[in-house]
Amino acid sequence: MALKSPAFRKKFPLLVTGSLLAMQPLATQFVVAAEQYDCSVSASGAWNCAPKSNAAAVDLPPRPVHDTTSVSSNGTVTSQSTSSGEQVAGTQLVTEAKGKGLRSRSADYSHLDWVPREKLTAAQLAETGPYCSGAYVEPIRPGMDDKTPMKDAPMFVGAKASRYEQEAQVATLAGDVVLRQGSMQVQAQEAALHQAENRGELNGDVRLRDNGALIVGDKAELQLDTGEARVDNAEYVLHKSNIRGNALYAKRAENAIIRLKDGTYTTCEPNSNAWTLKGNNITLNPATGFGTATNVTLRVKDIPVLYTPYIYFPIDDRRQSGFLPPTIAAGGDNGFTLVTPYYFNLAPNYDATLYPRYMADRGLLMEGEFRYLTKGSEGQFGGAYLNDENDDRKLQSDYDKTRWMINWQHKGGLDTRWLTQVDYTDISDPYYFQDLETDQIGVKRTDFLNQQGSLTYRGDSYAATLNAQAYKLATVANITPYNRLPQLTLNGTLPYNPGGLKFDYQTEAVRFERDLRSGAFIDEDGNSETRLDNNISGLARANGDRLNLAPSVSLPMNWTYGFLTPKLKYVYTQYALDLDSQGKSSLLAGEEYSSSQSRSVPIFSVDSGLYFDRNTNWFGKDYRQTLEPRLFYLYVPEKDQTDIPVFDTSESTFNYASLFRDNRFTGSDRIGDENKLSLGITNRWIEDNGFERQRFSIGQALYFEDRKVQLPGVVFADRDDARANVSPYALEYEYRFNRDWRFNSDFNWDPDSKSTRSGSAMFHYQPEDNPNKIVNLGYRYRNDQIRYDESTGRWIVGGGDYGRPGDANYVKDYYKIQQHDFSVIWPIVPQWSLISRWQYDYNRERTIEAFGGFEYDNCCWKMRLVNRYWVDYDEFSQAAPQNEKGDRGIFLQIVLKGLGGVTGAKVDSFLDKGIQGYREREDQAF
């Protein structure tokens, strides 16, 4: 039974309401107490009680019967003794549970709102980890979402029986006692409410609930006007965060902060003590979403393994300043490594993180980042600094022991039309990322670090961009790339279409320049060799301005059954060049230098296609089958471009899509001459819901003239594919067995040489309803690459050797690709999974990477142990093959869920890079 309190004085709202419950005004006019009284509420709001006659008392119900720890009339706890005089044992102390829940309170831990997995609803299962045997589910109760402040909220009280002592001003409740005010609810077997002291004492199976938190104990003291409480021999649960623990006593403050004395904290299930944090004083603040603890030991199976005087940890997913989980590693060139990140929650729209990284062999690396989010932009600044104590590279060129990195990434819009973007990274030396790790988000570890800023204006039918882009070398085994300083583009479509004609234009003005490195390169042993930039010769050493104009007119005609698009395009390019004396003296055969160059090339094409479909049935399944033939004619006359340098151009990789391009080169420095007819056909099988079960495409080009325009130094007469009458067959195939199984393949077959130019096949399996299972099997082959050879300064066609036969660093077919890649993560028994990958290079008969190990995963922690072999790349020479060295290691990763990774962050890194689907698996798991 529960009654809403009337308008009594606010000093003591809970006691007055409890007295009303004891009075039971709607059912009886009496209470059960040491003496019997008739009581009613006076006009002033006070009690008006008179003794009952003995005759009336005969018909009263029996007094409440109390258990072994009942509350006496004066509010003290009594105990029950056996006939021998021995005290009956009470509830087990939480200190005896060794980090687990108390089974003495409930064998199934239902006293902690624990619900076994088989009893969870579908919605609750979706929020439960895959290896959790259940979840903490807060029961629905009145007032659980009440936001009324405690001082203004009325109180409701219920009990099976009650009595009131007017002289002592103590109300005693017994049997399923419930006190509820605002969002807080307290349950117990017995309660004594003291009006004079404005407090309550509760005994027996005490449960305090408020704001998604539950505290269970043997007895409690409650401040009736503020909601402050102390619960002895306490266990607690934070439902949404799956957090639990215990304490000698727990205190709930008026602001709902929970303080634990000699308490524990864990995300493990009630029957598990796999890991716990145990501290002298633990504070949990639901308002901020974080907790603190002092004199903390991390315990595994109740065995202390780590001590810290202070820790700051999250209890939900909100941000708050404090230390993040540390990372501990050992081995490699850095020795023992400890990272202790500290997070600064500066404002809702910006924050910062400091990453002090101590390396025993190098010293202290200080790294930090600042992130911001505004109404029209987002981005981050970052930086790092280290005075390196490792002198392994002290003789090498370009090395600096004062090592640093800066980074800025930005995306924004001044309004709906103006866009800004910055991607800038700079480092002290080219070996920075080979020697040092970084914790900054978004920093890309590549050979060429991007240093770019752009401003774009988007009109209704056009876009204009001002771009400045440079590159910083993070390697000594590559030549210096060109910078675009600056670049201006204007691309768009005219807003009118007379007669259905479409007018497009592409405009670019750009300055290309680079500072080639001269002199000698010194390796780790002090040996000298010529820098790779010295191998660059002829027009490849030029800097210059380029203006490129490419207007076009087309007539798109589209019907339900197909399309036809004739198009005429005109490309005009103007160059203003600078060439140093070394370039002028080393021109390639046929090259001539002129400071002013121009080129104009017309391009005519006709693109057409048909669309056929029908309904069909395959193995009892209905499909829409399509047949989509495509015909593309392209004519580009030959234009001598030998005297034009190559700034940003290379030859496109041949595949099915390249059959329908109007230029076989990327960039604007070469316009390929072509007179060809490309034929292709695509077949699709589509289910009624739009799911594409299968797609198959095959095509080939018929050439009517040789392709004479080539990259510098490449002679078309030496290339069989430049003189062939037909292109290789280009095939693409994809089949989805279902939404879990997928097979992709592309294959390019040369009919003239009767050999494969390139191809790949990839099988991927990852069930949508169980992404923990992953199988990948792939094969790649490519022997048709067109690349620039840094060691010779020449363009090379085909797989390509490194160096020349007889050279000390010569490696045959170094750039030819012939590899298989197999990876798997597969559950072998519940909670145990096998992890493996094997990437093998058939061309060089070597394993590129192989690892194998296992993963154990449960509700509160995860462990991975992996034995790995890989080809490590650490530059001590300009010859790339000499920098490759096999390495081995055994990696251990331990993740305490709800606390963070203890060790092994590198395991997560190479699994993410090496196993397709790994990131989706981890995102689902957490």
Swiss-Prot record:
Residues 58-99 are annotated as: Disordered. Keywords: Cell outer membrane, Membrane, Signal. Component of the lipopolysaccharide transport and assembly complex. Interacts with LptE and LptA. It is found in: Cell outer membrane. It comes from the Bacteria. Residues 1-22 form the signal peptide. It comes from Pseudomonas savastanoi pv. phaseolicola (strain 1448A / Race 6) (Pseudomonas syringae pv. phaseolicola (strain 1448A / Race 6)). This is LPS-assembly protein LptD. The gene is lptD.
